Amino acid sequence: MSALRTVSGSSGNGKSYDSIMKILLIGDSGVGKSCLLVRFVEDKFNPSFITTIGIDFKIKTVDINGKKVKLQLWDTAGQERFRTITTAYYRGAMGIILVYDVTDERTFANIKQWFKTVNEHANDEAQLLLVGNKSDMDTRVVTYEQGEALAKELGLPFIESSAKNDDNVNEIFFTLARLIQEKIDSNKLSGPNSGKDGNISINANKGDSSKSNCC
């Protein structure tokens, strides 16, 4: 795997980055999208994170295969009443992370509906990635094998994570950014299934149990 790391400073052309990637996090309310984002960008964890209203976003510049890439990370609300607002942000997204909670089977079952919504509103070339969050919890009801099977069915890369324990959080965003960059470099920008056929699976280690709603 190519070296992936956070970078800072300015390039010779006066910009602090070479390119921009717009990435969305989607999934039911309470699956931990905001906590994953805050852990990645700020390396912080708040177990009582306030539910996102509409849209929020953060920015982080990283090094992808020697290129400085600015990630625009959009955190979308999972509630039904915000769906009309959030789907407008799908267009132009280069990467979309579909998140479910391994302790809540309903959020796992709803991934197929989120996937359908992505196919209806996002660009065909958008790179998708499936994430099972809260892997540290001992109240898990969705197994790693179930997540992996769903990812295979949908043709998506798959990672399990814990924002609380910081398990595989960086891997989520770096893996997606690398897949996007590889697609850009190889000019794979067309076709109904372009960018949706990954075989990457990363299993987070199980940690201590937690009663947090944002793990």
Swiss-Prot record:
Record-linked NCBIfam families: small_GTP
Pfam families with a match to the protein in the record: Ras
Start-end of Polar residues biased regions: 200-215
Function noted in UniProt: Involved in exocytosis. Maybe by regulating the binding and fusion of secretory vesicles with the cell surface. The GTP-bound form of SEC4 may interact with an effector, thereby stimulating its activity and leading to exocytotic fusion. SEC4 may be an upstream activator of the 19.5S SEC8/SEC15 particle. SEC4 probably interacts directly with SEC8; it could serve as the attachment site for the SEC8/SEC15 particle.
Gene: SEC4
Highest taxon, organism lineage: Eukaryota
Cellular compartments annotated: Cytoplasmic vesicle, Secretory vesicle membrane; Cell membrane
Membrane topology: Lipid-anchor
Lipid anchor positions (S-geranylgeranyl cysteine): C214, C215
Family as reported in the entry's similarity comment: Belongs to the small GTPase superfamily. Rab family.
Disulfide bonds: none
Stored SUPFAM superfamilies: P-loop containing nucleoside triphosphate hydrolases
GO cellular component terms, A-Z: fungal biofilm matrix; incipient cellular bud site; mating projection tip; plasma membrane; transport vesicle membrane
GO MF term list: GTP binding; GTPase activity
Motif (Effector region): 43-51
Natural source organism: Candida glabrata (strain ATCC 2001 / BCRC 20586 / JCM 3761 / NBRC 0622 / NRRL Y-65 / CBS 138) (Yeast)
Protein name stated in the entry: Ras-related protein SEC4
GO BP field: ascospore-type prospore assembly; autophagy; exocytosis; Golgi to plasma membrane transport; membrane addition at site of cytokinesis; protein transport; vesicle fusion
Transmembrane spans: none
